[in-house]
Amino acid sequence: MRILTTPSASIPLPAFFPDATYGAIRAGSFEDVDAAGLMGCEMNSYHLMTKPGAKLVKSLGGLHGFTGYRGAILTDSGGFQLYSLIHENPEYGEIRDKEIIFRPDLGREKLTYTPEKCIQVQFQYGSDIMMALDMCTHPDDPLEVQRRSVELTVKWGERCRAEFDKLTKKLDKKPLLFGIVQGGSDPGLRMECGRRLEEIGFDGYGFGGWPLDASGAFRLDILKMAADAMPDHKLKYAMGLGRPEEIAALVDIGYGLFDCVIPTREARHQRLYTWVPGMDNPKGVRRKDGKFYQFLYIMDDTHRREEGPVDPACDCAL
């Protein structure tokens, strides 16, 4: 079994990190995370920077002190959120060659977000795993946009690595730094990005980009392109994924770390996961349709009156 060693926890792989976007699990607690046997959480650099602010978080002992959570904390770079907002409305700012310019609330005040700033903010958070700044794209973006994304992702990765090395020079316990492989749906660009990031040297590598097509279908082929571009001796991180069936498919092609908002979102909308009968152990015979879990609609008239456990195969409190 592979182990991911961080300053706060040693984590058996594959592993899933629930999203605690603003430093909290929606409709749950970190005690719930521990009870579920999960050893880490993902938190959002950009959202925490806007509210409550990186300086305040640092003054309270970083994210571990601010949240009271003792497991591993992974923070993203904030690049995806800035890309999404600017892509939705260009008046929010622009992605320049050396930095991202962002104007919150379309006001006069502007945020200049550089690769160095990205790393400095994550050090203020005291993150166990930090992500380098990248330029995100959509699979349908034209080739010239994908090429620019790879070029900026590599250049920004170099600057993130240099800033990270400077800030960790005197540390005994060092956090981990992951690079992000971009390239859209072009295999050549994915391989180029992975090769150049490997030359810089990172502790792990994340999938960059959008994993769905225009109709919302899961693009496993793009995830495989990115996985093939990452060194096999390093951890491969499927950022923002996924559903149980996605995780199962992605483990098969080499990914070992996952995070996603979907499990907590499903629960808030009263949909719970339960095992398909016979699939709750490694010896279960896979069904022809590949399904190994099913939805239980907890507030349906049938289920709301049941006194038994949600799933007899699960030892959770429900």
Model-derived segments and their meaning:
Residues 313-318:
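Local cysteine-cluster metal-coordination motifs and their immediate loop/turn environment
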Residues 151-154, 163, 167, 174-311:
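Glycine-rich phosphate/ribose-binding loops and adjacent secondary-structure elements
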Residues 1-170, 290, 300-303:
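Non-catalytic, usually N-terminal nucleic-acid engagement modules in DNA/RNA processing proteins
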